[in-house]
Structures are given as structure tokens and as C-alpha cells.
Amino acid sequence: MNLVTNELTIIIILYEEKIDLVFKCLENIKNFKIIIVDNANNISLKKKVKKKFQIYKYLLNKKNCGFTKAANQAIKLCDTEYILNLNADCFITEENILKLIISHKKYKNCFITTPTFYDEESKLSYNAGCFAEKNLKRDILNLEGNVCVDTVIGTAILFKKSDMLELGLLDENFFLYFEDDDLCKRIKLKNKSVIQIFDAKAQHVHGQLKVKNFLKKIFNRNYNFTYDELYYYFKINKHHEKYEYLKKKLPNYIIKSIINFLTLRPSQSIYYFAKVKAFYNFKKIIKQEKVK
């Protein structure tokens, strides 16, 4: 295989994505060095992918260790100057990837370059904007030209490996959510820039996972979001309001979880149970900090 460039490795973290989605993503980037980490330990998918595409490294994790840990695994394995972290539900061409690299080199204090997103109907889609704690509506940036932003969603971000190592990699206390806000906040503290590149286009289709156990999906989504949100606000010392709000809701959530369980509505029962468990696990962090 003739690589488009020796400067870049593309890393993709998988967890039960549909095979046609994965194949479509890989088809666009097949001439780059690719590292895949699969948190679903899907041996069958690995065989099918490697039969069709040339993959530099393909790791299978025996359990779902979370996006941040898997991404850090992949970053450490990269031996190129630049890394593009790409979700399987994001389709970007070689030309647009090269635009991200060129733009990154152009801006002296740049840490991340990210493309402008479009949906399946070729309409602008959200990718970048303000930090979550600003409580502003996350409007789509409809501006011509490259734009410095507070934060981006981690769907397609290009950065230097050396910069990420110096920053300390992704915070593995996050499982899936808010890690992009946290990353960008740490970047800002280093006086580095996060830039959305206007001329670099990508299609983000928000692919659905094919999780077999629907109840497990409900639990994981609500537990991880609740915990990660509390942890993010804890890191910036703004968790008190959310923590106290959830604390007041706990008795109601526990009752609702039990009632829904007894009335054979498992999805609702698990929804509330996930939030309760996330609260108590986060509470352990609060206690640890008080001991220090």
C-alpha cells in the first residue's frame, strides 16, 4: 500500500458499530496508516475488516474499558508526528484530511484542527462551540473561514502526538462523555488553540450502535453520562449545584426505580437506577478529596 503521507496515523475506537458503517468509514481512509481498538472484543469484525483493508494495528479489548482508555492505548502505539482521532460514524476524504494537516502546520499555537461537519442531507452539523458550563445553546457555527473555538466534539480531531503526550493524554476517569470538553479546557490552559477548519469537510451521520442488550445500553448511557458530567464539573469546581440537585432527587429516583421494576417496566427502572449508582460512585471521589 502506498501511503498518502507518512506523517499521519488515524485511530478509530469501536464499540458494537454496524459493519457497513465501519467499512464506509475505512473505505475513505484506506490509504493512511490505521490503528483500530475495539472495546467490544469483536473477533468476527476484526477478521472481516483485515480481509478487506490493510490495518497497521488492530487491538481487541476483552472488556469495554471506555473511550478514553482505548484512545490512549492507540495514541501510545502511533509512530507518526500527527494523529487523527476519528469516529466510525464520520466520513472524511483524503483531501480533507490533508487540509487538516496543512492548517495545523500553518497556525503556530495550534493543538487541534477539526473539520466542518455536515449531516446526511449535506446540512451544517454541530462540531464546535462553547464549553458546557457556559450554559449556552450549542448553535452550529455558520461562519466562513477558520474559527478558534472553546471546544469540539471528539468525532474528528487532528493533533500532534508530542503535544498530547506533553498534555498527559486523555483523562481516563471519563468513560465516554465530556472528555472532549475536558481535553479542550486543558489545551486552553496551555495557551494552545482549537481550530475548526472551514474548507476541511466531513460527514457526521451519528451512527447507532447495534447493542444486543437494550437494557444494558440504557444503563450504560445514563450511568456514564451522569458520572462523567459530575466528574467534569468537579474538575472545574462547579459541581456543587448539579451534585446537590441530584442528591435531592435520589429518594424519588430510588422509589421510581423500584416501582417501575415491580410494574414490569425494566427500561424505566434501569434509567433511574443508573443515575443513583452514578451518584454514589461519584460521591466516593468527594470523600477522597476531603481526606486529602
Task: Please describe what each predicted stretch is.
Residues 73, 90-93, 98-169, 173, ...:
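Acidic/His-rich active-site region of diverse nucleotide-sugar glycosyltransferases
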Residues 83:
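Short aromatic/hydrophobic "clamp" motif used to bind/position activated sugar donors
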Residues 61-78:
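Glycine-rich, basic loop-to-helix element that forms the pyrophosphate-binding segment
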Residues 38-46:
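A conserved acidic beta->alpha catalytic loop
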Residues 12-30:
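Short, well-formed alpha-helical segments that are part of the catalytic scaffolds
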Residues 22, 220-228, 238-292:
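Non-catalytic, C-terminal membrane-associated alpha-helical segments of glycosyltransferases
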